[in-house]
Design a protein with these regions (language model features):
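Generic structural detector for well-ordered beta-strands
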Residues: 20-24, 88, 141-143
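Mid-chain, well-packed structural core segment of small domains
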Residues: 74-101
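Short, charged/polar low-complexity linear motifs in solvent-exposed/disordered segments
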Residues: 36-37, 49, 84, 101, ...
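Hot-dog-fold acyl-thioester-processing enzymes
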Residues: 1-81, 147-151
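HotDog/MaoC-like acyl-thioester-processing domains
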Residues: 1-18, 93-151
Length: 151
C-alpha cells in the first residue's frame, strides 16, 4: 500500500478488511436523513418510529450504503471507487446503536470489456450492531488502480 492506497497487483484474496466502528447519535440520524433529503418520519420522529414498533428513530438506507462503502474504501485507499453495490436491509440501526462493519475481499478480476481495462475487487461486508445482530449484508465491487496505470 502506498499513500494513494492499494494497487490491484498487491492485493491477495481472500483477505479480511480492518473493522470499522461507528457510534450512531440521535443527531446524526436526523442530520443524515436531512442531508440526503429522506424525509420519511421514521428517521426523525420518535413517535412515528415507535408507532411502527421501533424503540426510536433509525438510520436510512443511504447511511448504511455510505458506511459499507467506507469499510471498503478505507481499506483500498483514496484512488478506489465503488462501481457496484448490492445490499439487503435485515434489521434497523437505531439512534444510540453502534454500527460495526466487517469486510472481506473475496475475489479480484480484470474487466477487459472496456478500454482501458478495469481492475476490480469483490468485497463482502457485514454491518452488525453492538449486540452482534446482522443489520445489512452487502456485496460490492471496487475499482482500484493497476500497476500499469489502468484501473
Amino acid at each position: 500500500m502506498t499513500g494513494d492506497g492499494l494497487d490491484w497487483a498487491m492485493i491477495s484474496v481472500p483477505v479480511d478488511l480492518p473493522e470499522v466502528i461507528d457510534r450512531i447519535s440521535y443527531q446524526r440520524v436526523v442530520e443524515n436523513a436531512g442531508a440526503t433529503w429522506d424525509y420519511f418520519p421514521g428517521h426523525f420522529d420518535p413517535k412515528y418510529a415507535q408507532a411502527q414498533g421501533n424503540p426510536t428513530i433509525y438510520v436510512n438506507t443511504m447511511h448504511l450504503a455510505g458506511f459499507a462503502d467506507r469499510v471498503a474504501t478505507d481499506w483500498a485507499g483514496p484512488r478506489s471507487r465503488v462501481v457496484h453495490r448490492s445490499m439487503r436491509l435485515a434489521a434497523p440501526v437505531y439512534a444510540g446503536d453502534t454500527m460495526i462493519g466487517r469486510g472481506r475481499a473475496v475475489a479480484k478480476r480484470r474487466d477487459t470489456s472496456v478500454e482501458p481495462p478495469r481492475c476490480l475487487v469483490d468485497v463482502e461486508i457485514r454491518v452488525i450492531n453492538q449486540h452482534g445482530a446482522l443489520c445489512c449484508p452487502v456485496e460490492l465491487t471496487l475499482q482500484v488502480p493497476g500497476s500499469s496505470g489502468d484501473g
